Amino acid sequence: MDNKLFGTDGLRGRVNAYPMTPDVVMRLALSAGLHFRNGSRRHKVLIGKDTRRSGYIYEYALSSGFCAAGMDVFLTGPLPTPAISFLTRDMRADVGVVISASHNPACDNGIKFFDHMGFKLPDAVEAEIAARVEGYAQDWRLPDPDHVGRAFKLEDSPGRYNVFLKNSIPLDVNFEGLKIVLDCAHGAAYRVTPQVFEELGAKVIKIGVDPDGSNINQRVGSLFPQQVARMVAEAEADIGIALDGDADRVIVADEKGRILDGDQIMAICALDLMERGALPGNLLVATVMSNMALEVFMKDHGGRLLRTPVGDRYVVEAMRAQGAVFGGEQSGHLIFLNHSTTGDGTLAALQLMKIMVRKGKPLSELATLLSPFPQKLVNVPVARKIPFSEAPAIEAAVKDAEATLSGRGRVLLRYSGTESLARVMVEAQDAALVESLCDSLAEVVARALA
């Protein structure tokens, strides 16, 4: 079924432009409400958001649609995406909804859904909801006036999530004596995450905790970890933690100010799990974007890496299918399935710090486990998105690049699921070769898809 609304991580776009207009979002909620409503019992939907000013628009549009569909709405206010995933389970809600465009600027916003277990919706379910939105009609079977829903504020939602996060750390572990630099990107975690680390004993130097509705992700957070890295070195802190706007991803810096991406964090955590016999089948799940060095690392330590398409939802789907408990993305989405059903930047940082404490090692020493192969990624603006195989010039250029690499590297081309971009990635052990191949491929893609 064709799905024109949803991308790789829900609905996303510029505020007040299709599909992020109030009428489309209201119909989306109405469609989702009719999909999840089952029988005559009262149904519940949990709605959270990040700190964008436009969140108010979509909060009310969603509430209107869900109430019209006969569902009771519980509003959490600004809260991380993984908190909504957790609270959907905790509240026994039928569905959870997050209003956020994640790491995008404040001019964008988005909508993503979680099922009653806190998992992101499969493609097929999103397609069904999208089809009903596009086919909106006055004869939808809506409840009578006595059975429409009501809206409530869930005042204790941050506290519930706080307790959940602290319970992911054993009682014999605390962060007394550790100093951290924490960047919340002026986003959804600006209140709850600093509080969690402080209650666990850490001294927290906070940045990105003053949202004004328009400064989310503005040269802060996981896309700009250089600020955290610099401050860690200056403050002689033990670790720097940079979250994105909805706090479902994390990038860290060691005590020397060196930045670690999701692959390096996965290597540290996967080895710890393997050493404790807590990684079933010694299997780590990551995406096609993860560095080849991670694959080599897992093999060298008796494990294996399973790759999926880009998107933490696909990582989670593969983990569930394979019985895996840990996986993630190079971008910093990290999923500890024994604790959470989606990527959680705060939880991932807690697990990493737990390893530092238990091993008694600085992060810089743990980071030596993985030395990523040189990799270059170029985002190429495109006017159209056709299969790369249907562009002869691109196909020929890729074959030439792969022949040059001779199995000692990788070429990956894919489209962004949310923007008009083609992503060109090349990696190999020869940095100069990576640079030249990636630049030439990007030029070919730009000409072919202009």
UniProtKB/Swiss-Prot annotation:
Entry PTM: Activated by phosphorylation.
Cofactor binding description: Binds 1 Mg(2+) ion per subunit.
One term under GO cellular component: cytosol
Active site positions: 102 (phosphoserine intermediate)
Annotated positions binding Mg(2+): 102, 244, 246, 248
Function: Catalyzes the conversion of glucosamine-6-phosphate to glucosamine-1-phosphate.
PANTHER family from the UniProt entry: PHOSPHOGLUCOMUTASE (ALPHA-D-GLUCOSE-1,6-BISPHOSPHATE-DEPENDENT), PHOSPHOHEXOSE MUTASE
Name of the protein in its database record: Phosphoglucosamine mutase
Species whose genome carries this gene: Solidesulfovibrio magneticus (strain ATCC 700980 / DSM 13731 / RS-1)
